[in-house]
Amino acid sequence: NSAWMKTAGAVIYFVAPVAYQSFSTGSWDGLILFGCLPWMLLFLARASRSSPFGPIGGPTSRFAFEADIFREVLTLGFILGLVFSFSPLVLFAVTLTVVCLCVGSLVAGWKLGFSRLFLILILSYAMAAALNFPWILDYFFSDFSWNTIFHTRSTVAETVDLLGALRLQTELGQNSVFGWGFPALAFVPLMLARGERWAWAVRGCSLYLAGVAAIWVNGMGYLPFVLPRAEVLLVPAALGVAVASAMGVGSLQRDLQTYKFGWRQLIPVTAIIASCLVILPVLGSAFSGDWGIPDDELNDVLFSEEETNQNIRVLWIGDDDLLAASGRQFLDNYTISITSTLESTFIDRWQPPEQPADQFVAEAFDLALKNGTTNLGKLLAPFGITDVVLIEKSAPLPSKGLSVELPEKLKLSLSRQLDLAKIEIAPGINRYRNLSAFGFASSVEGVALIDKQFRTYASGTQPLSVSSLVATGATGTSYQGMIKQNSEVYLAFPFSDHWKAKLNGQTIQPSIALGWGTGYFSEESGLLEVTYETGKKHIYLMSLQCLLWFVAFVGLARSLATARRVQL
């Protein structure tokens, strides 16, 4: 109930450099977890009924809510579902937090409502999964792998060592004495705290050490996958330091006076020095007002208002930490991703399930790397790819940012392609325009693509006679144009019978083209209109999901409105 404890915990949490490093590197996962994890810890503490949120292990605070499993499951499940839709890493963070609470309680020898905690956690996970079921079914169950959660990261871009993790500093070589205030604030309370403050201080230290240990394990390569970025892994550590610091303030208020005069009376001086060490760097950074965010962005140099062509699909190659969009693994340590614009947005974080086209694109690049073709643009054209962008810096010079060089053989192979025109945007940022691109919807003379495999097309030497159809909407779901007799219409979209085509008002049936795309064959000339119609199953699932969110929100609002605090 101490205002000093609440203030101290909040201040120490907000001065932790992990949030500002997430700002400077554009880590959405880091920012999302930094904002939501304290609330998750609060809900988990209530679920465990541990003092002061319940009677287990000590007295109950007069500000605590009465126990209600239904309300607690609704609250935690709703927040989990909401955050999970933006960052699946929240499940990893919450699970780690629960493990640290349990381990900390066992080390401290303090009671914790384990059974109630796990019951509420499992039910909350189930509720979060139900709220996101259509997306989970499509994205996770279709082809689940560790990359589904942790993306295609590599250790190439890691910029933190063990000592840096102890100081919550995520940049290699950032040897600042100020960061040593964080471990001091984490462990000093263990020398003073008593009772439930001792238990929560140990739990906070468990969170802190778990975050640091995750950095160390990831750096040593002991796991079969690469963990998230350092600023993400250190969010639980920052929260643990904040919890322990709050308990330290409480122990200075309540527990210090219970000890005889001795060395413990020097601990307040140590705590004050440690607090100054961690607060001063933030005050210094506040003068600039940008918190380390680069002055220039990739969007500033890649995208211009003059480029209004909607028939554009960009293939990005770089380290996963440098790319805004999620993607697939490429050349072991790098990532390849595809977006519909040169301007990176938050929406690019949602990557569709893997398609056969992904494998074909990888094969095309593999062929180019082995000097098997000098017309890579032709091989990428059936996938609608109009541009290839190589990213080696997270921000253009002179701004500072992450920098990961791409293999020289990749850059040399692209320079040998006759149908890729290089546009040097900035040092470390190169764009190649595909001169062989023929758009998302095209009319092709003769029988060239339908019922043929991509490898057959790639080995062909005859040029195609292609003319693009005109997009009739801003969403890229409808096209039209005049086509000749005995010609094909090719759509650079995965095959689906939801594409409806009419030639002179008569419906024609789709066929598979190049082993993945959608094609139509016309035996007569005339006006062709192609439109994508969303399937009823998809509409029903989305309607069900919206209904579930509405019911969950109404139930949560009603349960919170009727919640009562403990009467002491």
Model-flagged regions — what are they?
Residues 385-386, 430-437, 527-535:
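Short, hydrophobic/aromatic-enriched beta-strand segments in well-ordered soluble domains
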Residues 27, 98-101, 142-148, 328-336, ...:
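Short secondary-structure boundary/capping segments
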Residues 451-568:
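Active-site-proximal, structured, solvent-exposed surfaces of multi-pass membrane proteins
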Residues 1-291, 295, 300-303, 309, ...:
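Membrane-embedded transmembrane-helix bundle of lipid-linked glycan/lipid transferases
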Residues 395-432:
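Short acidic, glycine/proline-enriched helix-loop-strand junctions
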Residues 416-421, 435, 444-447, 467:
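Short glycine-aromatic motifs
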Residues 77-79, 175, 201-204, 231-233, ...:
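Active-site lining segments that contact anionic ligands and/or coordinate catalytic metals
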Residues 80, 277-281, 305-387, 391-397, ...:
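Extracytoplasmic/lumenal acceptor-recognition loop(s) of multi-pass membrane glycoenzymes
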